[in-house]
């Protein structure tokens, strides 16, 4: 019996940014962690900034996504995002600096509500980048200090 793979497509406003096949896609949706395999029931979910793992046989592509929407059919996973980067292209020092800058804004008692919302968003994105980076290296990353 031949193995059946999901078609996986990650699209941004610029077009397709990742295309491949997978026997398993794992990600965090609005309802929690999901593992998606060929034949999965149809669903539509929002995605926070986070990590998407696309596994085919023994190889896993680790992707950082800025958040978006995932559409699942029994044979296809389509992820629509504003931004996506492969974990191997992420810069740990930049992500750590972004995280530190966001935390400084959040510590500022004079920060406006708008600044706090933007800092919270940047903090979540930096944490997701670090998680993608570290999971691609086989490490576990906790956002707690």
From Swiss-Prot:
A Pfam short name: ATP-synt_DE_N
GO CC entries: plasma membrane; proton-transporting ATP synthase complex
Keyword annotations: ATP synthesis, Cell inner membrane, Cell membrane, CF(1), Hydrogen ion transport, Ion transport, Membrane, Transport
Any one GO MF annotation of this record: ATP binding
SUPFAM superfamilies membership: Epsilon subunit of F1F0-ATP synthase N-terminal domain (SSF51344)
Source superkingdom: Bacteria
Subcellular location(s) per record: Cell inner membrane
CDD domains membership: F1-ATPase_delta (cd12152)
NCBIfam families: ATP_synt_epsi, PRK13452.1
Record text on subunit structure and interactions: F-type ATPases have 2 components, CF(1) - the catalytic core - and CF(0) - the membrane proton channel. CF(1) has five subunits: alpha(3), beta(3), gamma(1), delta(1), epsilon(1). CF(0) has three main subunits: a, b and c.
Function recorded in the entry: Produces ATP from ADP in the presence of a proton gradient across the membrane.
Protein name, as recorded: ATP synthase epsilon chain
């Amino acid at each position: 019996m031949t193995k059946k793979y999901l078609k996986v497509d990650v699209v941004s406003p610029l077009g397709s940014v990742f295309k491949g096949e997978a026997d398993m896609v794992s990600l965090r949706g609005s309802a929690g962690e999901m593992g998606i395999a060929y034949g999965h029931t149809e669903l539509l979910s929002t995605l926070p900034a986070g990590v998407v793992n696309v596994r085919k046989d023994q190889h896993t592509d680790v992707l950082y996504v800025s958040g978006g929407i995932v559409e699942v059919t029994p044979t296809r996973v389509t992820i629509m995002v504003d931004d996506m980067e492969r974990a191997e292209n992420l810069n740990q020092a930049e992500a750590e600096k972004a995280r530190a800058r966001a935390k400084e804004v959040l510590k500022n008692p004079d920060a406006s509500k708008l600044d706090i919302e933007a800092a919270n968003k940047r903090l979540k994105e930096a944490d997701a980048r670090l998680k993608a980076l570290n999971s691609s290296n086989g490490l576990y990353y906790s956002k707690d200090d």
